[in-house]
Amino acid sequence: MTTDKDKMAVGRLKSRPQFLAVRAGESRRGPLFLLEVLDRNDPEGEARVGFTVTKKHGNAVERNRMRRRLKEAVRLSAGFAMKPGHDYVIVARRDLLNAPFDALTRALRDRIENKPKQKRPPAGSRKS
């Protein structure tokens, strides 16, 4: 069981410009969702999170269910892993509907805590 100390206050992204700003940050892809992360360079500010579910992933009932599952996963287990001064946008994928909830929370925690591996530079840019 988690205590109040384990849960960190997580703010919300609400306006379109806030969501668009996060797109300039790094992306962390996964089978259940895409996580976009932006460092606001504000270590005193709270972490903020926004949720996106596009219309191509189902009707309103299914989209709302995906959004509710993501919100609950952040509330229960992933909020503590979010770094202060960072913005997070979670873009749901269709497989999120049928995934077990514990797999969802585990994947979310892993994506938040682990930075993506560095991509190799293009072949022409290497020094010999």
UniProtKB/Swiss-Prot annotation:
Annotated Gene Ontology cellular components are:
ribonuclease P complex
Q: Give the keywords, sorted.
A: Endonuclease, Hydrolase, Nuclease, RNA-binding, tRNA processing
The catalysed reaction is:
Endonucleolytic cleavage of RNA, removing 5'-extranucleotides from tRNA precursor
Stored Pfam families: Ribonuclease_P
Give the gene symbol: rnpA
Question: This protein's superkingdom?
Answer: Bacteria
Know the name of this protein?
Answer: Ribonuclease P protein component
- Organism equals Rhizobium meliloti (strain 1021)
Report the EC number(s), separated by commas if there are several: 3.1.26.5
Q: What does this protein do?
A: RNaseP catalyzes the removal of the 5'-leader sequence from pre-tRNA to produce the mature 5'-terminus. It can also cleave other RNA substrates such as 4.5S RNA. The protein component plays an auxiliary but essential role in vivo by binding to the 5'-leader sequence and broadening the substrate specificity of the ribozyme.
Set out the biological process GO terms recorded for this chain's protein: tRNA 5'-leader removal
User: Span of the secretion signal?
Assistant: none
Per the similarity annotation, which family is this?
Belongs to the RnpA family.
HAMAP family referenced in this protein's UniProt entry, alphabetically: RNase_P
Q: Which InterPro entries match?
A: Ribosomal_Su5_D2-typ_SF, Ribsml_uS5_D2-typ_fold_subgr, RNase_P
Residue ranges annotated as coiled coil are none
Subunit composition and interactions = Consists of a catalytic RNA component (M1 or rnpB) and a protein subunit.
The entry lists its GO molecular-function terms as: 3'-tRNA processing endoribonuclease activity; ribonuclease P activity; tRNA binding
